[in-house]
Amino acid sequence: MSKQDLIEMEGTVTESLPNAMFRVDLDNGFNVLAHISGKIRRNYIKILPGDRVKVELTPYDLTKGRITYRLRKK
């Protein structure tokens, strides 16, 4: 699967789960289970409940995703 097939959305982290998993409420109202991408994990970027994040979803399973970016707070 190429990067063109991925669906990228923004959302808010609502819950932190074990093993670097997070529950994210997307802007369109859906709720997904997301894990952290390797670059965020490698650079020790902390993600807390309430943070705005970018999530990549595959068209095959829209209930799971990957957090690729933590948006800055305004």
From Swiss-Prot:
The alphabetical list of record keywords is:
Cytoplasm, Initiation factor, Protein biosynthesis, RNA-binding, rRNA-binding
What domain of life?
Answer: Bacteria
Q: CDD domains, per this entry? A: S1_IF1
Checking Pfam families in the record gives: eIF-1a (PF01176)
Q: Does the keyword Membrane apply?
A: no
Q: Where in the cell is it found?
A: Cytoplasm
GO cellular component terms, semicolon-separated: cytosol
Gene Ontology molecular function: ribosome binding; rRNA binding; translation initiation factor activity
Q: How does it assemble?
A: Component of the 30S ribosomal translation pre-initiation complex which assembles on the 30S ribosome in the order IF-2 and IF-3, IF-1 and N-formylmethionyl-tRNA(fMet); mRNA recruitment can occur at any time during PIC assembly.
Relate the protein's function as given in its record: One of the essential components for the initiation of protein synthesis. Stabilizes the binding of IF-2 and IF-3 on the 30S subunit to which N-formylmethionyl-tRNA(fMet) subsequently binds. Helps modulate mRNA selection, yielding the 30S pre-initiation complex (PIC). Upon addition of the 50S ribosomal subunit IF-1, IF-2 and IF-3 are released leaving the mature 70S translation initiation complex.
What protein name is recorded for this chain?
Translation initiation factor IF-1
- Source organism of this protein record: Nostoc sp. (strain PCC 7120 / SAG 25.82 / UTEX 2576)
